[in-house]
């Protein structure tokens, strides 16, 4: 927002619903002008973030596409790796790192710049230790998958290739903090350029491993390690070699202080996001226990891949909204945080509607990117309606979660996710899938309408009833608390 509207006193802010008119906009030259200003601010973050998300996710999609043309078993194994082994850990570590959006975003808004570098170093340590604790999921992937009901051939192949993605697992610990560190400083173009370079390298390496050296499924998965670590190398060099002079002041012994308190905050963020992320991973695992599991897993994994690809857009809005809300609250501007929320939700919903229509129109052609099997393509076609509904709901829900991250509500949203997803959605999906014999369509439909839809509705209610002036005050108190804590250490 501009200085005039940003400095306007908020009168009776607590009683004004989120979706009512923005009075400061009229004072600053009209609603349209304020919407345009806020839209530019959001797109400055979201635009490069969308490209970054698409490029990063495309690394896994391209890998899956290569595997799909090797055979149905290979596609199923890669799908399990992406959605279970990597997917579970990705969700937890990304969720824990999202606490940096609250800390760095509000510190940046309050002009406490040096703390961003300290926070990033602390999260490198925290996430690296978490990666060590999560290693058994890779080392014992085969027995774990067999225990939860996956077929022996899929479990054996998945366990073999799981060992080849352990370097990617540890890459998460360094990439996520670097990404949030730069993102909160609005250096999204740097992140996007690095992601684009890494994607281009991955395509070459993947083709070379699979078709040049004929390494098959092992070469396909091994190629994933190269772009992730290249991305980290580029971002690290930029951050530490003059690109962030205000926020990076060198390695600090302060990185080893306050780790326990930050871990507690990270746990709330991790639980909030991973409960949501794991929800759809569990859908994949339950499908593996159905009759004709290979076709069911392949078709659902294709739908989840398309959804995940499109999901990079609302996730960019998740990140952008979190940064905008955190910056405004850190600057003491509750009104600006509220207005940023309105604009961000509206933009994301419009894009979601567009892609929903695209999926409905091209419902019978979606699967051809990943497979040439007629049975798999028909199964994907049958699931396209549910895919469209999922895309539409996900155009709103992540943005609301971004508001939660920017405001520091992670612990509350974690309870909401637990209740909606696992106490309502999951049992509903199981009932529809097995008791009423609707198979994968029943499981997915039950989990969408029983979990995601209810969770989105609750978040809408919470956001519309939010007292934004009070949130700005709490942000100021939180920043002072951490500064005093660091001074004491």
UniProtKB/Swiss-Prot annotation:
- Coiled-coil spans are none
Quote the subcellular location field of this record.
Membrane
A GO MF annotation of the entry reads: antiporter activity
Q: Which GO terms describe its cellular component?
A: membrane
Q: Which InterPro entries does the entry link to?
A: MATE_euk, MATE_fam
The transmembrane residues are 42-62, 75-95, 125-145, 157-177, 190-210, 217-237, 271-291, 300-320, 342-362, 385-405, 416-436, 442-462
Transcription regulation keyword on record? no
- Predominant place of localization: membrane
Keywords from UniProt, A to Z, are: Membrane, Transmembrane, Transmembrane helix, Transport
* Secretion signal, residue range per the UniProt entry: none
Q: Give a yes or no for keyword Transmembrane helix in this entry.
A: yes
Annotated GO biological processes are: xenobiotic detoxification by transmembrane export across the plasma membrane
Topological relation to the membrane, as annotated: Multi-pass membrane protein
**Protein family (similarity comment):** Belongs to the multi antimicrobial extrusion (MATE) (TC 2.A.66.1) family.
UniProt name for this protein? Protein DETOXIFICATION 26
The gene designation is DTX26
């Amino acid at each position: 927002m501009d200085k005039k509207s940003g400095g306007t006193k908020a009168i009776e802010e607590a009683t004004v619903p989120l979706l009512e008119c923005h009075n400061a906009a009229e004072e600053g030259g009209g609603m349209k002008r304020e919407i345009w200003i806020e839209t530019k601010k959001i797109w400055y973050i979201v635009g490069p973030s969308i490209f970054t998300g698409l490029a990063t996710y495309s690394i896994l999609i391209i890998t899956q596409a290569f595997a799909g043309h090797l055979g149905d078993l290979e596609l199923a194994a890669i799908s399990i790796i992406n959605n279970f082994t990597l997917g579970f850990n990705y969700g937890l570590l990304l969720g824990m790192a999202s606490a940096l959006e609250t800390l760095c975003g509000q510190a940046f808004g309050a002009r406490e710049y040096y703390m961003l570098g300290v926070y990033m170093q602390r999260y490198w340590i925290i996430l690296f230790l978490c990666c060590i604790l999560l290693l058994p999921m890779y080392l014992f992937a085969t027995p774990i998958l067999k225990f939860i009901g996956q077929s022996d051939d899929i479990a054996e192949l998945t366990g073999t290739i799981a060992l080849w993605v352990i370097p990617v697992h540890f890459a998460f610990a360094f990439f996520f903090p670097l990404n949030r560190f730069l993102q909160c400083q609005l250096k999204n173009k740097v992140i996007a350029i690095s992601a684009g370079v890494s994607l281009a390298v991955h395509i070459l390496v993947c083709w070379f491993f699979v078709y040049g050296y004929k390494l098959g499924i092992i070469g396909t998965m091994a190629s994933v390690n190269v772009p992730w670590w290249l991305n980290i190398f580029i971002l690290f060099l930029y951050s530490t070699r003059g690109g962030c002079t205000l926020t990076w002041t060198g390695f600090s012994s302060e990185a080893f202080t306050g780790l326990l308190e930050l871990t507690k905050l990270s746990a709330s963020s991790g639980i909030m996001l991973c409960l949501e992320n794991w929800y759809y991973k569990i859908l994949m695992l339950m499908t593996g226990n159905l009759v004709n599991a290979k076709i069911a897993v392949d078709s659902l994994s294709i739908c989840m891949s398309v959804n995940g690809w499109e999901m990079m857009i609302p996730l960019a809005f998740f990140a952008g909204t979190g940064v905008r809300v955190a910056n405004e609250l850190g600057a003491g501007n509750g009104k600006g945080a509220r207005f940023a929320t309105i604009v961000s939700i509206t933009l994301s919903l419009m894009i979601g509607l567009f892609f929903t229509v695209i999926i409905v129109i091209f419902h019978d052609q979606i699967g051809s990117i990943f497979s040439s099997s007629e049975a798999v393509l028909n199964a994907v076609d049958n699931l396209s309606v549910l895919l469209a509904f999922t895309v539409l709901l996900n155009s709103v829900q992540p943005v609301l979660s971004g508001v939660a991250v920017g405001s520091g509500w992670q612990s509350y949203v974690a309870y909401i996710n637990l209740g909606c997803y696992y106490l309502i959605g999951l049992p509903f999906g199981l009932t529809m899938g097995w008791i009423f014999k609707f198979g994968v369509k029943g499981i997915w439909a039950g989990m969408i309408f029983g979990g995601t839809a209810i969770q989105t509705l609750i978040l809408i209610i919470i956001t519309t009833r939010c007292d934004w002036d009070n949130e700005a005050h709490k942000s100021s108190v939180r920043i002072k608390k951490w500064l005093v804590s660091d001074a004491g250490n």
